[in-house]
Swiss-Prot record:
Matching Pfam families: PapZ_C, RapZ-like_N
Function, as annotated: Displays ATPase and GTPase activities.
Keyword list, A-Z: ATP-binding, GTP-binding, Nucleotide-binding
Source organism per UniProt: Streptomyces coelicolor (strain ATCC BAA-471 / A3(2) / M145)
Keyword Secreted attributed: no
Protein name per Swiss-Prot or TrEMBL: Nucleotide-binding protein SCO1952
Coiled coil location: none
Length: 299
């Protein structure tokens, strides 16, 4: 029979860890939030501060499915800013482990960023960008003072900011790279989301082998036919090795997703067979891999 003390301890252990992301518009809040999302955090954008304790409570009831929550708080919710300190006090009383991350940047850097995207500052009204920046600094002054971590992004690019977030929150967790290996047919067009494209039309086409034509590259006989062609296995070995090199570089640069497109004429035989083999090689190297055969059923 469980005691009340044991039950309370179990409930306390289930309370999610919380990170509140705030800071200057244009300083990188979205990038910081995306980094935490890629590390497995449950991220909520522009949640009114008064609802943060409710979000934490819902996470505590998720039976461990939501162990880490990140909430982005910015000037779009300025009407609710007065509730933030009250919410933080509530969280502290509950024993919630929470951190405030504040993204900072110089006026010059922020002006350049707003001008580069040709967007107004959310607080500038009829004034200039610098007027909006000044108003926002004043609005966020107390929150910045309460921050557990202030990151100045004035001279940082996206990859450098991600590296700083990883250093703070990844712990021993290696940044994951998720790869999609997609077979396709050139006759149906290139995949618009492909990062890398490779062409299998240098191999003989099983379409012209009557007993293989009805099947796809998932068929063992078709796959063997493709892989036993001159140059096929050498290509597989060399390209798989190249992909491992590229994957290591993507991890260093903070890239989390890559789509490798493998094409042939119709996307039914050669590209399908080679995609399966390449995906298996990537998975064996620890890359989380998904295989998609975009055009396999179109003929």
């Amino acid at each position: 029979m469980s005691t009340g003390k044991e039950t309370a301890g179990a409930h306390e252990a289930a309370i999610p860890e919380l990170v509140i992301i705030s800071g200057m518009s244009g300083a990188g809040r979205s990038t910081a939030a995306k980094c935490l999302e890629d590390l497995g955090w449950f991220v909520v954008d522009n949640l009114p501060p008064a609802l943060i304790p409710t979000m934490v409570e819902l996470g505590a009831r998720s039976q461990g499915n939501v162990a880490r929550i990140a909430v982005v708080v910015d000037v779009r919710g300025r009407r609710f800013f007065d509730n933030l300190r009250e919410s933080l006090a509530d969280l502290d009383a509950r024993g919630v482990t929470r951190r405030i991350v504040f993204l900072e940047s110089s006026d010059d850097a922020l002006v350049r960023r707003f001008e580069s995207v040709r967007r107004p500052h959310p607080l500038q009204g009829d004034g200039r960008i610098v007027d909006g920046i000044a108003a926002e600094r004043e609005l966020l002054r107390e929150l910045r003072g309460d921050a557990d971590l202030v990151i100045d992004t004035s001279s940082l690019n996206v990859h450098e900011l991600r590296a700083k977030m990883d250093a703070q929150f990844a712990g021993d967790q290696e940044p994951e790279l998720r790869a999609t290996v997609m077979s396709f047919g050139f006759k149906y067009g290139l995949p618009v989301d492909a990062d890398l494209v490779v062409d299998m039309r240098f191999l003989p086409n099983p379409h012209w082998v009557p007993e293989l034509r009805p099947f796809t590259g998932l068929n063992e006989e078709v796959s063997s036919y493709v892989l036993n062609q001159p140059g096929a296995k050498e290509f597989l070995d060399r390209y798989a090795e190249l992909l491992q090199l590229i994957a290591a570089g993507y991890r260093r640069e903070g890239k989390r997703y890559v789509t490798v497109a493998v094409g042939c004429t119709g996307g039914k035989h050669r590209s399908v067979a080679m995609s399966e083999k390449l995906a298996a090689r990537l998975a064996a190297e620890g890359v989380e891999t998904v295989v998609v055969h975009r055009d396999m059923g179109r003929e």
